[in-house]
């Protein structure tokens, strides 16, 4: 018999993605490909796409968590752009990070200037004192 075929030798191990090795949901392989194709640097290290995918996954999870809370507060089960806007603008750090970002169909935060609110009159308090 020739040395070809699958009879002898070791069976090849099942392929394991770099995302699963890193314990991530975001695709490490795709991030690596995009880093190489994007002309950001001549060479890309093996750890760079793992780190970047982890950062992107963390930020996404953080925003979705807050947006889910905003949706629940509005008695909705589906996250819409308005919920994303409320989540980002009410969080100090995310608002700083995404300060120059416009979210389509996001609306604005409800805000009434203090000077526009009706003034409390003193006559109402004096009537109670007598």
UniProtKB/Swiss-Prot annotation:
<dbReference type="InterPro" id="IPR032454">
    <property type="entry name" value="Histone_H2A_C"/>
</dbReference>
<feature type="modified residue" description="N6-glutaryllysine; alternate">
    <location>
        <position position="119"/>
    </location>
</feature>
<feature type="modified residue" description="N6-glutaryllysine; alternate">
    <location>
        <position position="96"/>
    </location>
</feature>
<feature type="modified residue" description="N6-crotonyllysine; alternate">
    <location>
        <position position="126"/>
    </location>
</feature>
<feature type="modified residue" description="N6-glutaryllysine; alternate">
    <location>
        <position position="120"/>
    </location>
</feature>
<keyword id="KW-1017">Isopeptide bond</keyword>
<keyword id="KW-0007">Acetylation</keyword>
<keyword id="KW-0539">Nucleus</keyword>
<dbReference type="InterPro" id="IPR032458">
    <property type="entry name" value="Histone_H2A_CS"/>
</dbReference>
<feature type="modified residue" description="N6-(2-hydroxyisobutyryl)lysine; alternate">
    <location>
        <position position="37"/>
    </location>
</feature>
<comment type="similarity">
    <text>Belongs to the histone H2A family.</text>
</comment>
<feature type="cross-link" description="Glycyl lysine isopeptide (Lys-Gly) (interchain with G-Cter in ubiquitin)">
    <location>
        <position position="16"/>
    </location>
</feature>
<feature type="cross-link" description="Glycyl lysine isopeptide (Lys-Gly) (interchain with G-Cter in ubiquitin)">
    <location>
        <position position="14"/>
    </location>
</feature>
<feature type="modified residue" description="N6-(2-hydroxyisobutyryl)lysine; alternate">
    <location>
        <position position="10"/>
    </location>
</feature>
<keyword id="KW-0238">DNA-binding</keyword>
<comment type="function">
    <text>Core component of nucleosome. Nucleosomes wrap and compact DNA into chromatin, limiting DNA accessibility to the cellular machineries which require DNA as a template. Histones thereby play a central role in transcription regulation, DNA repair, DNA replication and chromosomal stability. DNA accessibility is regulated via a complex set of post-translational modifications of histones, also called histone code, and nucleosome remodeling.</text>
</comment>
<keyword id="KW-0832">Ubl conjugation</keyword>
<feature type="modified residue" description="N6-acetyllysine; alternate">
    <location>
        <position position="6"/>
    </location>
</feature>
<keyword id="KW-0158">Chromosome</keyword>
<dbReference type="InterPro" id="IPR007125">
    <property type="entry name" value="Histone_H2A/H2B/H3"/>
</dbReference>
<dbReference type="InterPro" id="IPR002119">
    <property type="entry name" value="Histone_H2A"/>
</dbReference>
<feature type="modified residue" description="N6-(2-hydroxyisobutyryl)lysine">
    <location>
        <position position="76"/>
    </location>
</feature>
<feature type="cross-link" description="Glycyl lysine isopeptide (Lys-Gly) (interchain with G-Cter in ubiquitin); alternate">
    <location>
        <position position="120"/>
    </location>
</feature>
<feature type="modified residue" description="N6-glutaryllysine; alternate">
    <location>
        <position position="126"/>
    </location>
</feature>
<comment type="subunit">
    <text>The nucleosome is a histone octamer containing two molecules each of H2A, H2B, H3 and H4 assembled in one H3-H4 heterotetramer and two H2A-H2B heterodimers. The octamer wraps approximately 147 bp of DNA.</text>
</comment>
<feature type="modified residue" description="N5-methylglutamine">
    <location>
        <position position="105"/>
    </location>
</feature>
<keyword id="KW-0597">Phosphoprotein</keyword>
<dbReference type="GO" id="GO:0031507">
    <property type="term" value="P:heterochromatin formation"/>
</dbReference>
<dbReference type="Pfam" id="PF00125">
    <property type="entry name" value="Histone"/>
</dbReference>
<dbReference type="GO" id="GO:0030527">
    <property type="term" value="F:structural constituent of chromatin"/>
</dbReference>
<feature type="modified residue" description="N6-crotonyllysine; alternate">
    <location>
        <position position="119"/>
    </location>
</feature>
<keyword id="KW-0379">Hydroxylation</keyword>
<feature type="modified residue" description="N6-succinyllysine; alternate">
    <location>
        <position position="10"/>
    </location>
</feature>
<feature type="modified residue" description="N6-(2-hydroxyisobutyryl)lysine; alternate">
    <location>
        <position position="119"/>
    </location>
</feature>
<feature type="modified residue" description="N6-(2-hydroxyisobutyryl)lysine">
    <location>
        <position position="75"/>
    </location>
</feature>
<feature type="modified residue" description="N6-succinyllysine; alternate">
    <location>
        <position position="96"/>
    </location>
</feature>
<feature type="modified residue" description="Symmetric dimethylarginine; by PRMT5; alternate">
    <location>
        <position position="4"/>
    </location>
</feature>
<feature type="modified residue" description="Phosphothreonine; by DCAF1">
    <location>
        <position position="121"/>
    </location>
</feature>
<keyword id="KW-0164">Citrullination</keyword>
<feature type="modified residue" description="N6-(2-hydroxyisobutyryl)lysine; alternate">
    <location>
        <position position="96"/>
    </location>
</feature>
<feature type="region of interest" description="Disordered">
    <location>
        <begin position="1"/>
        <end position="22"/>
    </location>
</feature>
<feature type="modified residue" description="N6-(beta-hydroxybutyryl)lysine; alternate">
    <location>
        <position position="37"/>
    </location>
</feature>
């Amino acid at each position: 018999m020739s040395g070809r075929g699958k009879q002898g030798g070791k069976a090849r191990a099942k392929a394991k993605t770099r995302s699963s090795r890193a314990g991530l949901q975001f695709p490490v392989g795709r991030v690596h490909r995009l880093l190489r194709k994007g002309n950001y640097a001549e060479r890309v290290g093996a750890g760079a796409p793992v780190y970047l995918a982890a950062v992107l996954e963390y930020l996404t999870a953080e925003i979705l968590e807050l947006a889910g809370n905003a949706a629940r507060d509005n008695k909705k089960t589906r996250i819409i752009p308005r919920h994303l806007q409320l989540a980002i603008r009410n969080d100090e750090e995310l608002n700083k990070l995404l300060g120059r970002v416009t979210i389509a169909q996001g609306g604005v935060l409800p805000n009434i200037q203090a000077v526009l609110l009706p003034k409390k009159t003193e006559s109402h308090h004096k009537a109670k004192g007598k």
